[in-house]
């Protein structure tokens, strides 16, 4: 079964949960390291999604600065 890709919002929510758990300090060292590693992966995912969004937004404006209509995928 294929794994569903996380949305930006899902990744941020999971990252916030991890940060709260790490700040709490009640997890074992091993669990903390696992959460930290997952947090790094989620951070990279979020950065990639933001870069993709930035590139899409850059295409909305032509080189001359003239705005063109923005159409989201599937609309």
Curated annotation (Swiss-Prot):
GO terms for molecular function: exodeoxyribonuclease VII activity. Keywords: Cytoplasm, Exonuclease, Hydrolase, Nuclease. It catalyses: Exonucleolytic cleavage in either 5'- to 3'- or 3'- to 5'-direction to yield nucleoside 5'-phosphates. GO terms for biological process: DNA catabolic process. Bidirectionally degrades single-stranded DNA into large acid-insoluble oligonucleotides, which are then degraded further into small acid-soluble oligonucleotides. NCBIfam families: PRK00977.1-2 (NF002138), PRK00977.1-3 (NF002139), PRK00977.1-4 (NF002140), PRK14064.1 (NF010667), xseB (TIGR01280). This is Exodeoxyribonuclease 7 small subunit.
């Amino acid at each position: 079964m294929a794994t569903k890709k996380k949305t930006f919002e899902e990744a941020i929510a999971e990252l916030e949960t991890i940060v709260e758990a790490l700040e709490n300090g009640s997890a074992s060292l091993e669990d903390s390291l696992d959460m930290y590693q997952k947090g790094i992966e989620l951070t990279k995912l979020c950065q990639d999604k933001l870069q993709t969004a930035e590139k899409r937004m850059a295409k909305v404006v032509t080189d001359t600065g003239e705005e063109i209509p923005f159409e989201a995928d599937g609309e």
